[in-house]
């Protein structure tokens, strides 16, 4: 049986090496996010200040996989 993933929205605050980012979630948690393979293959640029959807395991709440970059009009701001 596949593990259920939690999906949150957040804001990229810092860019780190090797496709890693510091992400501030909407619930004010600060986690480490890495780019999913689909985003990496599509050459989607993610910069500090972008809003993203991030998928987290329920077992490790300090890391997550960035699965979608929200457009400016898609975000809730």
From Swiss-Prot:
Keyword annotations of the record: Chloroplast, Initiation factor, Plastid, Protein biosynthesis, RNA-binding, rRNA-binding
Gene3D superfamilies: Nucleic acid-binding proteins (2.40.50.140)
Ranges of residues in domain S1-like: 1-71
Location within or outside the cell: Plastid, Chloroplast
Keyword Translocase: no
GO MF terms, alphabetically ordered: ribosome binding; rRNA binding; translation initiation factor activity
Primary location class: plastid
CDD domains: S1_IF1
GO cellular component, one term: cytosol
Keyword RNA-binding carried by entry: yes
General function of this protein: One of the essential components for the initiation of protein synthesis. Stabilizes the binding of IF-2 and IF-3 on the 30S subunit to which N-formylmethionyl-tRNA(fMet) subsequently binds. Helps modulate mRNA selection, yielding the 30S pre-initiation complex (PIC). Upon addition of the 50S ribosomal subunit IF-1, IF-2 and IF-3 are released leaving the mature 70S translation initiation complex.
Family under the similarity heading: Belongs to the IF-1 family.
Quaternary context: Component of the 30S ribosomal translation pre-initiation complex which assembles on the 30S ribosome in the order IF-2 and IF-3, IF-1 and N-formylmethionyl-tRNA(fMet); mRNA recruitment can occur at any time during PIC assembly.
Name recorded for this polypeptide: Translation initiation factor IF-1, chloroplastic
Organism in which the protein naturally occurs: Phalaenopsis aphrodite subsp. formosana (Moth orchid)
């Amino acid at each position: 049986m596949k593990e259920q993933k939690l999906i949150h929205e957040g804001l990229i605050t810092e860019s780190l090496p090797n496709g890693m980012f510091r992400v501030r979630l909407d619930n004010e948690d600060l986690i480490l996010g890495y780019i999913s393979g689909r985003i990496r293959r599509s050459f989607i640029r993610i910069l500090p200040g972008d809003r993203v959807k991030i998928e987290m395991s329920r077992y490790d709440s300090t890391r997550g996989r960035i699965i979608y970059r929200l457009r400016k009009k898609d975000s809730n701001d």
